Each structure stands twice: as structure tokens, then as C-alpha cells.
Amino acid sequence: MLTEQQRRELDWEKTDGLMPVIVQHAVSGEVLMLGYMNPEALDKTLESGKVTFFSRTKQRLWTKGETSGNFLNVVSIAPDCDNDTLLVLANPIGPTCHKGTSSCFGDTAHQWLFLYQLEQLLAERKSADPETSYTAKLYASGTKRIAQKVGEEGVETALAATVHDRFELTNEASDLMYHLLVLLQDQGLDLTTVIENLRKRHQ
């Protein structure tokens, strides 16, 4: 989040009291929308944890999702080098655009976003009927069975690589990724946790 010093250094005069705000998906990096904040909108955003803009058409504070329920939950806020633009990393609840797309800039989603969406779907499957969902059936079978599937798919992936079968390798790697994501969800972990750990190792 913004530090007190960063807030004091924001150049509101340069932006005539309305600062451009770029909102980016905290996980996928997809640019979701552009809005404007005045000091009051920034204060409310920091207090509520939900992105709030100053609407130039309505001439009032406007919390994204206040009508639709598609809120933008704030992860972090950072100023640019000139202190006249803000970058907000957020986790969206539902589509960001009123047209139903994830981004107000159309279908610009990075391929990595699909993994996040798949992860969300797998989390929802925890409460699904095991009779109607393979994923729910996996969860119901317990951690040992899920871990066994990860092991099996790992071996099959390795075997496909040893015979240089790229088609089969792609299929087996997909199965491995799927079951690994299920195992992470089963253990209360997610891709973000793994990515952060990889970043620490890379430093």
C-alpha cells in the first residue's frame, strides 16, 4: 500500500485534483481499466480496500461494483515516478467491464489468466457434487489419492518426454498441471504462493 510519505508526495495540483489510475489484475497482470481518483476517492479506497473512483459524469465518489457487485479488491497501490499517476493491483470479483468482459480494453487477457480462472473453478468444485464432477470426486477421495494422481501423471509426463512424443507430452503435462492445481487447492495453497516462492529463490 501507499506509505504516508508517498501520499504526501502525490502531485494533485499537476492533475487538477483528478489523478489517472490504472487498475491491473494482481495475479495475471491484465490491465483491467482506467479511472480517476481525487484525494477523497483515494482515502475511501484505502479505508475500504475496494477501488473507488471519482466519477466525472456523476460528479461523485463511485465504488467500482457498488451496483453490479463486481468489486475490485485492492492488493497494492503505487505511484509512478512523477507522482501524478497511480497503479492499483487488484483482485476482481466478476467481470470488470460493464459489457461483461474481464477488461475494459476488450479481450486482451494474457494466457496466464486462464490458469487463474482454472484455479478459481477448481476452488468452487470443492463444494460440488462428487457424482457430477470429476474434480469434486477427487477432493472427496482425499489427499492421498490426489497426491497419487500427481505422481502418476508426473511419471507419464516423463515417459512421454523420453520417447520424444510432443503431442503426448503436451497432453500428459496438461493432466499433470491440472492434478497439481487440485492438490494445491486441497492443501489450502495456490499458484500465487508457488510463484512468490520461486521469486524468492531467484533473488
From Swiss-Prot:
Stored Gene3D superfamilies: MazG-like, Phosphoribosyl-AMP cyclohydrolase
MF annotations from Gene Ontology: ATP binding; phosphoribosyl-AMP cyclohydrolase activity; phosphoribosyl-ATP diphosphatase activity
Annotated phenotype, changing residue 46 to I: In strain: F719
Effect of residue 5 to L: In strain: F719
Effect after changing residue 164 to N: In strain: F719
EC number: 3.5.4.19, 3.6.1.31
Pfam family, one: PRA-CH
Subcellular location: Cytoplasm
GO process terms (BP): L-histidine biosynthetic process
Cysteine pairings via disulfide bonds: none
Pathway: Amino-acid biosynthesis; L-histidine biosynthesis; L-histidine from 5-phospho-alpha-D-ribose 1-diphosphate: step 2/9; Amino-acid biosynthesis; L-histidine biosynthesis; L-histidine from 5-phospho-alpha-D-ribose 1-diphosphate: step 3/9
GO cellular component terms attached to this protein's record: cytosol
Catalytic activity entry: 1-(5-phospho-beta-D-ribosyl)-ATP + H2O = 1-(5-phospho-beta-D-ribosyl)-5'-AMP + diphosphate + H(+); 1-(5-phospho-beta-D-ribosyl)-5'-AMP + H2O = 1-(5-phospho-beta-D-ribosyl)-5-[(5-phospho-beta-D-ribosylamino)methylideneamino]imidazole-4-carboxamide
Stretches the record annotates as Phosphoribosyl-ATP pyrophosphohydrolase: 115-203
EC category: hydrolase
Location of the region described as Phosphoribosyl-AMP cyclohydrolase in the Swiss-Prot/TrEMBL record: 1-114
Keyword Protein biosynthesis carried by entry: no
Keywords, comma-separated and alphabetical: Amino-acid biosynthesis, ATP-binding, Cytoplasm, Histidine biosynthesis, Hydrolase, Multifunctional enzyme, Nucleotide-binding
Principal location listed in the UniProt entry: cytoplasm
Protein family: In the N-terminal section; belongs to the PRA-CH family.
Protein's UniProt name: Histidine biosynthesis bifunctional protein HisIE
Source organism: Escherichia coli (strain K12)
Organism lineage: Bacteria, Pseudomonadati, Pseudomonadota, Gammaproteobacteria, Enterobacterales
Gene name linked to the record: hisI
